[in-house]
């Protein structure tokens, strides 16, 4: 045994003791656990969360070890914390085990959380002793065994395991002593007897049992003792008999203890075996920490610390004590007092969970001890307040609260905005109305009696006004598409945009708005528009415009969100269920932003009829009569709502406005309801409690519940019961300060079904914003009598008028939205107030940029008007917030207005002014912003000392400057910061070194700042000293080298030149004018800045001399305030040394941007021009700014559209630019001397924005963002028109027929039902005749291509996204028939193999899209003598059973495999040599090796997309038209084949790959296909999983440069075992691909045959509009099938291509036809898109018209059919604008 650690510890002035009681804390246990759960979500409480998780997992494991009878006592366990509220479980059979676990969990969660908040307190535990009573001793064991806070999770879980096992074991043993009735109230196993001594009590018991025959195990005994009381324990019946029958005990004051779990502290019942059973090794994870690491634990039986070897034995000792030893707390108190008396301590800190009698006894004893200790009582519960912290980061996304940051709606009653919706609610409006005519004709579809078929019994509903209103061009839809697209989708798009706009969303602005991390989730339960409106005339957009998945998909596509998009249908709860799914995605971390909502637009009369028939609907003229006694069903309603949700911490980081916070959400199902459509109160209550637990919310803290409240008797009463049970129970009543209000929006807006939950959620958010609960208008007679009359007792209220719902600082408002669906789903969501926000300081900028933009001028005018109205209503709005909201938090469109302003009044005035000019605004081209030129100012433009506000306000600019200053000081130069930061007066003169470095470095920093806010230069120019900054920004020199050159040059100037000896003078004249006016006086030109701007330099005397005649001539002369005369002879003394320094110390690189050189008067692009000599010359020679600009303009480097930004302290170069290039529209300064930086910058930024430069507004505002607020400005003003397909007539009443079903039976019945031969491609023999004497036969088979294996084989070879029968399918058919015929005629031998020869495919066999219809082919095999071969013919069969012209022919010849291999052996070494050569070329980098994935990806992108089974090539080597491949055949088998097509293709389609993927063929313009081959033979079977090599070389023919031939060799283990000889390929223009390979039932083709005849195809991209006369057509009809593109060497004569020749011979249209064709094409486009011809301006893009891929196909097909212009849909990608297409048409037909 080891010694206890108290003997070895170093004593301190303060001793610590942790006391773990056997009683629960006085605080409400549910509330305690709720707080623990809430705090476990925070990042600082990871150990707390881990303990709760470990404890939960531990009890789950223990429950699994129980008998099934006991397991059934437990409900599914989410968290051990939930046991606190399970009263049934706590009062049941295992109450001892349950309460033991809960006590430990309560103590451990409190302790761990306390230590995580106060980590230093772990040191107190390390030196403390531990005391406890009962199960509390197990908590002490856990703490004793832990060395760190993290250890407490594992040791605490073991304490939980021990307590549970102990409780279960005690239950089992106690049941053997006295079996209790589980249905009766639990009875106690212990009484405390007061005012008696242990001796007296024991004497009484001894006397009582002296002559008793009771078994010892049934006797009452003393289980705990103290000086003045004892606790007696025993079986309940025996114990009750004792205290009522014994006079001694009856007359003593006794109290029944809450001990219901069984007997403990009973040495006569338990022994070591019982201890061992509890401590069994199964799943016990206590780490055996040595005794030296343990804290001392005081034994309650001996009064001394346990003497143990390790932590496990400590647990075992405590278990033994709890089972077999009586409690003697007095001895513990005495020992602690005695121990402390031996120390030097003057103070004892007792950590505990609240006052208790044992703890008070200990405190009293310590205080009265001789040591007179000061006792400090430290309550561990103190850290856990009643309100959870609001500003602490969550532990991970699962623990995050969620913030709703944007919302928008379209609802009945004219509620087309959030504000109008609130107005409807506030005024208590019932929005029901007669069904409007745009939905359907009520007169013909209404029958109140319900006797007429398919008619509705109600004529009322709640409807959105004009649901067809939509801005189609804004959302890139054509009018035709917009009209077809379901208005649910359209309004989802619109409300999503508005919600995102309210949220201040800009793509990729922050981490949470990355496009890849945004998903959409929308609820939709009906497809009315598709079923009725669209269904009247099914068109191109029927599927993408009507199928539900396209709703959220369209939102993702429009906004380019790359996250998930879900359409969710849970009936009436779809909307809120979609929001809940979005929340779960945010909690899981799947997305960072969710756009979610619900949609419902009613147009189908069947919905009304069906719901009336199911008794769902009210017949009256009212919205839902929610909670009314006469409620008779609900009123159907429209509704569309969208919300934007983020995690709360992201929303706060993003500076979003938070409308409300989601604490929890969940969905379950009413599985026990009486019917699927009937709600269930129990399941709704279960869900509510579950979500409340997860959210950590006390139900009594909920102050408002928005109920589903449909106005049905069943739904309302069930829902109300669930709400009352959870939120307003009678068992635990609400206080007067906790009123609960309930409401239901359906009383106003009707039941919008799949949008109902979204509507309710928006209502609650508006209530939070407005601090008012709107009146409930559903009760018009009296309240539903089923609800009872105890609302007052429950403190529950229904508001019948506007009721205040104020926010208070000390208490958050919590609301619940409850929603359920007719399919049985229930969804609940808990919300609370947004956290309060405060602004610490205001924006230091005085001038700001406010912008407005739109896609149309109409919208822009309306946007301006809306902002003016907003300012009128909010005159106190801060201009900084308007700027922030309109710039950084709004999408920017092509029509733009920008205003630089400093006050609201000025802004409003400017808005009026700009409104009048909108007519003249031109749209910017976002894809082509104007080029930007940076001009860098030279010396002398600024004050001697600057005070840059940009340096003061912007950390990034300041950091740029500091980095440059650090480089400056590192090179030994003086810091230049003092010349920029305002620390000196503006006229303070600095040294030349500081002045020049300050100028260049501030310009570098300024250029980088412009770049950081999105303004990047395309070209640069520097004036004099500014050229160094320009060179750095262009990438010629590094910043360090720029500083080196400028600093050393300035030093040399100081050392070699005298300040003031020379001057520079600006003259407002040209050099010629100066020459004429100089009167012969000499002068030096330093700078030629413009046509009339020249700077002279010279000695002081020279300048004075020249100045006089110049001024006399009327020329303006200004002396420049510079220390030295640059570009003059004054600099001569330093030139040699300066050049040497530059040559040895600086690296000059190739410019990354063009540099306009004022020295050379030209633009520099190369790496050699700027060097050491250049900077020498630039110091001495003249600056010719004029010549430089002229040269740049001449070569096109700059132009009139170039935007100039001057980088420097004052605009100088801008004037030079304007005078030299008058066409320049914008030349803008960065700073202006004497003007605040932000004023100048704002003015320039505003102008840059209006010409199309994309400003990074987020970066511009970043330094000030926390002081800015996103305003809820008016939404974008859409330019809406009505797009609506009206339901016509009454066909919904009369629909139904069986015509198509009967037709299908006829067609399906054409094939016989049985067949002697049946494979996947040879399915039915319809005729066969054999003559064994002559060897003749005829066999006719038919196969349906729609048979799954056949169809899969075709779709395994996809071209133009269609399944195409590869030639290898025809090969398999041929092999199958050959083997069948030879076997039938008795001529099939062991080594017999078959040669499929002379295959010619004249038409492609393309699979139908509609697989419901059969697609039958017939193959006829015939021969007069099988030894001479068999002829095969392929034909299509139509629905009537008639055969079409043959589309393929072939012949079959038998051969001997060994003969073939022998004949090929002479070629083997040649083929192997070519393969080795190809491998060598790869090693030399002259050939390409492609991997499996790369090869097939390339193949798919160029022509054929193969299924996995076809993808046998593992690697490919390609060199021109020659190649080889390593092949491994698939082992995945399906179907019945003779030679599987995917085996043939795998070994042979190398030829097709070469022809379509080699760089020898232009795959962008052409594709290559094969009509067949000469022979195809395999000497060995093709085996699954076997490996082969293929080799081919394709050779163009001499006769036809579009025809190629080759031989494909197949090798196995170096031996040729197969040959596809004479495979043929022809090259076609890619524009023909769609024409040749489209499904026969495709709607965009006029050819409806089963195969695609390409005999009329052409190589010309645009065939003529005039038809060829019949006489010109060729008789031959050779056509080429897509199939297996293989190919090979060995030229032979090309097959005839008369069809191609015929088309090539067509005449081009004459020039006079071109304009006609162009005009007709434009009209066709206008008709298809649904716009006026006048709208098709040249600069209009097809994407702007809504021409997507589908519309492209439609227009292309219309061109083919009407104009005979054969194009495909990619035409509108190649020619993006109307003008581009118009030019192409004109050029083609000119």
Curated annotation (Swiss-Prot):
Residues annotated with O-(pantetheine 4'-phosphoryl)serine modification: 1749
Region annotated C-terminal hotdog fold, chain positions: 1487-1634
Domain Ketosynthase family 3 (KS3) span(s) in chain numbering: 399-833
Stretches with biased composition (Polar residues): 1654-1664
Annotated spans, N-terminal hotdog fold: 1323-1475
Domain PKS/mFAS DH span(s) in chain numbering: 1323-1634
GO molecular function, one term: 3-oxoacyl-[acyl-carrier-protein] synthase activity
UniProt entry keywords in alphabetical sequence: Multifunctional enzyme, Phosphopantetheine, Phosphoprotein, Transferase
Catalytic activity from the UniProt record: holo-[ACP] + 8 malonyl-CoA + 8 H(+) = atrochrysone carboxyl-[ACP] + 8 CO2 + 8 CoA + 2 H2O
Keyword Cell membrane: no
Region (Disordered): 1644-1667
InterPro entries: Ac_transferase_dom_sf, ACP-like_sf, Acyl_transferase_dom, Acyl_Trfase/lysoPLipase, Ketoacyl_synth_AS, Ketoacyl_synth_C, Ketoacyl_synth_N, Malonyl_transacylase_ACP-bd
Induction notes from the record: Expression is positively regulated by the transcriptional regulator wor1. Exhibits high expression at the early stages of infection when runner hyphae were growing on the tomato leaf surface. Expression drops after penetration when the fungus is colonizing the apoplastic space between mesophyll cells. The expression is induced at later stages of infection when conidiophores emerge from the plant and produce conidia.
Residues in Carrier domain copies: 1715-1789
Pathway(s) where this gene product acts: Pigment biosynthesis
PROSITE patterns, alphabetized: CARRIER (PS50075), KS3_1 (PS00606), KS3_2 (PS52004), PKS_MFAS_DH (PS52019)
Knockout or disruption consequences: Impairs the production of cladofulvin. Does not affect virulence.
Region (Product template (PT) domain): 1357-1631
Region (Malonyl-CoA:ACP transacylase (MAT) domain): 934-1254
Active site positions, chain numbering: 572, 708, 751, 1357, 1545
Protein name: Atrochrysone carboxylic acid synthase
Species annotation: Passalora fulva (Tomato leaf mold)
């Amino acid at each position: 045994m080891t010694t206890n650690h108290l003997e070895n510890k170093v004593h301190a002035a303060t001793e610590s003791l942790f006391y773990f009681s056997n009683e629960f804390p006085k605080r409400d246990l549910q509330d305690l656990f709720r707080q623990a759960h809430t705090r476990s979500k925070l990042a600082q409480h990871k150990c707390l969360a881990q303990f709760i998780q470990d404890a939960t997992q531990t009890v789950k494991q223990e429950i699994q070890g129980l008998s099934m009878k006991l397991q059934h006592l437990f409900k599914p366990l989410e968290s051990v914390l939930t046991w606190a509220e399970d009263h049934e479980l706590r009062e049941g059979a295992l109450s001892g085990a349950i309460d033991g676990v809960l006590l430990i969990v309560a103590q451990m969660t409190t302790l761990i959380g306390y230590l995580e908040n106060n980590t230093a307190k772990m040191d107190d535990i390390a030196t403390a002793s531990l005391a406890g009573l009962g199960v509390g001793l197990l908590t002490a064991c856990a703490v004793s065994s832990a060395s760190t806070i993290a250890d407490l999770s594992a040791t605490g879980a073991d304490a939980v395991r021990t307590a549970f096992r102990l409780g279960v074991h005690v239950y089992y043993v106690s049941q053997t002593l006295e079996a209790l009735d589980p249905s009766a109230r639990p009875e106690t196993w212990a009484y405390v007897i007061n005012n008696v001594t242990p001796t007296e009590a024991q004497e009484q018991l001894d006397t009582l049992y002296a002559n008793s025959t009771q078994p010892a195990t049934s006797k009452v005994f003393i289980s705990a003792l103290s000086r003045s009381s004892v606790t007696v324990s025993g079986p309940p019946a025996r114990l009750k008999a004792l205290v009522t029958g014994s006079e001694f005990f009856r007359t003593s004051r006794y109290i029944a203890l809450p001990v219901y779990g069984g007997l403990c502290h009973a040495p006569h019942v338990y022994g070591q075996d019982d201890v061992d059973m509890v401590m069994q090794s199964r799943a016990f994870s206590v780490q055996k920490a040595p005794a030296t690491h343990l804290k001392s634990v005081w034994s309650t039986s001996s009064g001394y610390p346990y003497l143990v070897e390790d932590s496990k034995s400590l647990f075992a000792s405590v278990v033994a004590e709890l089972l077999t030893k009586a409690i003697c707390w007095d001895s513990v108190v005495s020992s602690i007092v005695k121990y402390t008396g031996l120390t030097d301590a003057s103070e004892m800190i007792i950590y505990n969970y609240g006052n208790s009698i044992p703890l008070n006894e200990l405190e009293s004893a310590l205080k009265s001890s001789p040591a007179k200790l000061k006792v400090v009582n430290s309550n561990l519960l103190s850290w856990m307040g009643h309100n959870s912290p609001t500003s602490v980061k969550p532990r991970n996304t699962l623990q995050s609260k969620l913030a709703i940051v944007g919302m928008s709606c379209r609802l009945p009653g004219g509620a087309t905005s959030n504000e109008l919706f609130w107005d409807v609610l506030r005024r208590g409006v019932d929005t029901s109305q007669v069904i409007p005519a745009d939905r359907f004709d009520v007169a013909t579809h209404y029958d109140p009696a319900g006797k007429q078929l398919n008619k509705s019994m109600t004529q009322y509903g709640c409807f959105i006004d004009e649901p067809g209103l939509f801005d189609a061009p804004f959302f890139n839809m054509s009018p035709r598409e917009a009209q077809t697209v379901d208005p649910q989708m359209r309004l989802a798009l619109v409300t999503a945009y508005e919600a995102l706009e309210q949220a201040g969303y800009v793509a990729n602005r922050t981490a949470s708005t990355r496009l890849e991390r945004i998903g959409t989730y929308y609820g939709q339960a009906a497809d009315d528009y598709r079923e009725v409106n669209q269904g009247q005339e099914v068109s191109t957009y029927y599927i993408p415009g009507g199928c539900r998945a396209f709703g959220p998909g369209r939102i993702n596509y429009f906004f380019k969100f790359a996250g998930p998009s879900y359409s969710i249908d849970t009936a009436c709860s779809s909307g809120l269920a979609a929001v809940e799914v979005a929340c779960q995605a945010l909690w899981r971390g799947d997305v960072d932003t969710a756009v979610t909502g619900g949609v419902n637009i009613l147009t189908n009369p069947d919905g009304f009829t069906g719901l009336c028939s199911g008794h769902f609907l009210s017949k009256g003229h009212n919205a839902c009569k929610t909670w009314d006694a006469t409620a008779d069903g609900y009123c159907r309603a429209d509704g569309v709502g969208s919300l934007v949700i983020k995690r709360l911490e992201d929303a706060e980081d993003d500076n979003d406005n938070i409308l409300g916070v989601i604490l929890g959400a969940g969905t379950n199902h009413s599985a026990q309801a009486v019917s699927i459509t009937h709600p269930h109160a129990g399941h709704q209550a279960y869900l509510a409690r579950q979500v409340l637990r997860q959210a950590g919310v006390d139900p009594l803290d909920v102050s408002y519940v928005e109920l589903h409240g449909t106005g049905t008797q069943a739904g309302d009463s069930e829902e109300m019961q669930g709400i009352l049970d959870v939120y307003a129970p009678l068992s635990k009543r609400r206080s007067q300060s906790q009123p609960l209000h309930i409401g239901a929006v359906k009383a106003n807006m009707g039941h919008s079904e799949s949008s109902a939950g979204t509507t309710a959620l928006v209502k609650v958010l508006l209530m939070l914003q407005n601090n008012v609960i709107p009146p409930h208008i559903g009760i018009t007679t009296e309240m539903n009598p089923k609800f009872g009359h105890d609302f007052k007792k429950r403190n529950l209220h229904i508001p019948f008028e506007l009721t205040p719902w104020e926010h208070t600082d000390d208490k958050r408002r919590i609301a619940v939205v409850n929603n359920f669906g007719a399919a049985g789903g229930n969804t609940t969501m808990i919300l609370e107030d947004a956290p309060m926000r405060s602004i610490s300081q205001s924006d230091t900028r005085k001038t700001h940029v406010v912008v407005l933009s739109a896609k149309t001028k109409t919208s822009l005018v309306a946007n301006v008007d809306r902002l003016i109205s907003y300012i009128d209503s909010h005159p106190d709005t801060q201009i900084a917030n308007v700027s922030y909201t309109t710039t950084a938090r709004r999408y920017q469109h092509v029509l733009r207005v920008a205003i630089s302003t400093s006050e609201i009044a000025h802004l409003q005035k400017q808005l009026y002014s700009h409104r009048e000019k909108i007519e003249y605004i031109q749209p910017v081209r976002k894809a082509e912003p104007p080029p930007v030129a940076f001009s860098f100012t030279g010396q002398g433009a600024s004050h001697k000392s600057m005070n840059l506000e940009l340096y003061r306000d912007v950390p990034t600019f300041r950091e740029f400057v500091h980095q440059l200053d650090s480089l400056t000081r590192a090179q030994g130069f003086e810091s230049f910061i003092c010349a920029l930061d305002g620390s000196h007066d503006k006229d303070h003169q600095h040294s030349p070194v500081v002045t020049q470095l300050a100028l260049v470095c501030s310009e570098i920093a300024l250029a980088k700042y412009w770049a950081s806010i999105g303004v990047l230069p395309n070209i640069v120019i520097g004036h004099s000293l500014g050229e160094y900054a320009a060179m750095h920004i262009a990438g010629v020199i590094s910043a360090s080298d720029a500083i080196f050159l400028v600093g050393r040059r300035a030093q040399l100037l100081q050392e070699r030149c005298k300040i003031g000896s020379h001057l520079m003078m600006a003259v407002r004249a040209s050099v010629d004018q100066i020459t004429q006016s100089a009167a012969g006086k000499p002068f030096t030109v330093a700078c030629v800045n413009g046509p009339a701007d020249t700077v002279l330099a010279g000695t002081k005397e020279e300048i004075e001399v020249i100045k006089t005649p110049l001024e006399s001539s009327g020329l303006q002369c200004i002396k420049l305030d510079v220390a030295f005369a640059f570009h003059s002879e004054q600099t001569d003394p330093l030139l040699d040394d300066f050049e040497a320094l530059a040559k040895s110390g600086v690296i000059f690189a190739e410019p990354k941007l063009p540099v306009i050189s004022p020295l050379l008067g030209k633009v520099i692009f190369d790496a050699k021009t700027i060097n050491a000599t250049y900077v020498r010359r630039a110091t001495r020679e003249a600056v010719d700014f004029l010549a430089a600009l002229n040269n740049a303009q001449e070569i096109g480097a700059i132009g009139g559209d170039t935007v100039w930004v001057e980088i420097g302290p004052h605009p100088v170069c801008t004037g030079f630019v304007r005078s030299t290039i008058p066409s320049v529209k914008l030349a803008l300064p960065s700073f202006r001397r004497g003007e605040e930086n932000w004023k100048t910058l704002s003015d320039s930024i505003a102008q840059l924005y209006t010409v199309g430069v994309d400003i990074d507004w987020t970066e511009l505002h970043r330094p000030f963002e926390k002081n800015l607020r996103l305003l809820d400005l008016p939404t974008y003003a859409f330019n809406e028109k009505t797009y609506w397909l009206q339901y016509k007539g009454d066909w919904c009443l009369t629909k139904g027929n069986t015509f198509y079903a009967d037709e299908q039976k006829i067609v399906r019945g054409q094939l016989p039902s049985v067949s002697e031969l049946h494979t996947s491609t040879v399915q039915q023999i319809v005729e066969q005749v054999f003559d064994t004497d002559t060897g003749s036969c005829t066999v006719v088979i038919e196969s349906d291509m729609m048979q799954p294996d056949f169809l899969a084989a075709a779709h395994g070879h996809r071209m133009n996204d269609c399944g195409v029968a590869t030639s290898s399918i025809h090969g398999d058919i041929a092999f199958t028939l050959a083997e069948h015929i030879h076997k039938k005629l008795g001529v099939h031998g062991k080594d017999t193999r078959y040669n499929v020869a002379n295959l010619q495919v004249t038409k492609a066999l393309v699979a139908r899209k509609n697989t419901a219809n059969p697609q039958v082919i017939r193959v006829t095999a015939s021969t007069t003598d099988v030894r001479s071969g068999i002829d095969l013919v392929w034909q299509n069969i139509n629905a009537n059973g008639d055969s079409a012209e043959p589309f393929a022919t072939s012949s079959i010849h038998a051969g001997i495999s060994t003969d073939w291999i022998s004949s090929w052996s002479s070629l083997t070494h040649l083929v192997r040599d070519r393969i080795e050569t190809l491998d060598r070329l790869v090693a030399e980098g002259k050939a390409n090796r492609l991997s499996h994935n790369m090869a097939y990806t390339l193949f798919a992108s160029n022509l054929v997309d193969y299924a996995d089974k076809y993808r046998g090539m593992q690697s490919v080597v390609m060199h021109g038209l020659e190649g080889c491949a390593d092949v491994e055949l698939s082992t995945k088998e399906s179907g019945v084949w003779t030679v599987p097509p995917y085996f043939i293709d795998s070994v042979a389609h190398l030829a097709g790959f070469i022809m379509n993927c080699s760089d020898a063929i232009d795959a962008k313009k052409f594709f290559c296909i094969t009509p067949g081959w000469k022979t195809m033979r395999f000497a060995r079977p093709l085996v699954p999983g076997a490996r082969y090599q293929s080799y081919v070389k394709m050779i163009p023919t001499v006769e036809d440069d579009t025809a190629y031939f080759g031989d494909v060799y197949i090798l196995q283990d170096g031996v040729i075992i197969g040959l596809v000889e004479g495979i043929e390929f022809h090259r076609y223009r890619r524009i023909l691909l769609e024409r040749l390979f489209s499904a026969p039932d495709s709607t965009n083709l006029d050819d409806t045959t089963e195969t695609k005849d390409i005999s009329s195809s052409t190589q010309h991209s645009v065939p003529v509009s005039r038809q060829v006369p019949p006489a010109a057509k060729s008789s031959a009809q050779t056509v080429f099938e897509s199939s297996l593109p293989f190919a090979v060497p060995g030229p032979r004569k090309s097959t005839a291509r008369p069809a191609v020749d015929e088309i090539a011979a067509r005449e081009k249209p004459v020039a006079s036809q071109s304009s006609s064709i162009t005009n007709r094409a434009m009209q066709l486009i206008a008709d298809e898109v649904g716009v006026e011809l006048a709208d098709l301006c040249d600069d209009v893009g097809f994407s702007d018209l809504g021409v997507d891929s589908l519309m492209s196909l439609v227009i292309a097909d219309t061109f083919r059919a009407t104009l005979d212009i054969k194009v495909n849909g990619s035409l509108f990608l190649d020619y993006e604008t109307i003008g581009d297409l118009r030019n192409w048409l004109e050029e083609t037909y000119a």
